[in-house]
Amino acid sequence: RTHLFACGIKRKSIKWICRENSEKITVCVPDRKIQLCVANFLNSRLETMEKFKEIFLISVNTEAKLLYNKNEGKDPSIFCNELRNSFSDFRSSFIGDDMDFGGNTDRVKGYINTKFSDYYKEKNVEKLNNIKKEWWEKNKANLWNHMIVNHKGNISKECAIIPAEEPQINLWIKEWNENFLMEKKRLFLNIKDKCVENKKYEACFGGCRLPCSSYTSFMKKSKTQMEVLTNLYKKKNSGVDKNNFLNDLFKKNNKNDLDDFFKNEKEYDDLCDCR
């Protein structure tokens, strides 16, 4: 029970935090990742490799419990996605290729590196990274099973399969897309509820004003976030096929490109046009 208090109750709002790192590169991070349960690492001396593994198992198990409590068992697909995304982010945090920075993220990264350097009597950074990657490959199945062990009745057999390794930026773009579509739908349903009696060009008045402005602000902020994420993707993928992943994402949403992604639907214009 005490281990749950080492990590806070999950915030339920969908949010992305965009910040500039030390290299002057802006990174947008899902709030889910910012809340990843890594505090137990910092609350332990991690004297031995066995203790490190014990704390890692506790952390993934606690993360799953907190995500389940956040979801309240309402949507298995959302719970599944968050489980799998958090597991992948545990890997990135451990391996050292996490795009998130600051706070516990940097402290945990440095602490784990120090401990693994002690465990293996190795100071060379490249060799140390290879050691961590080998350790992950050896232990990932056990970590994943420990993460889902109490929730196998709440997820599908497909969801229970250990997540395949995929670049963090790809996973975050997919997660952003899922978050975007959910929030867009919620805000648009509010417009339809509040503005159904609205007459053309009068949306800026009465109860229709706030839903329309909230939707507009959300779309503007979301476009900035997606531009940041796609720029990060292109920086990390310089090959000939660098746009394939993004193009597939646009096609999945029946869009042609980034600009098309954020065009207002005709129904929005009909309900919220207040020129």
Predicted feature locations:
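Intrinsically disordered, low-complexity segments
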Residues: 1-275
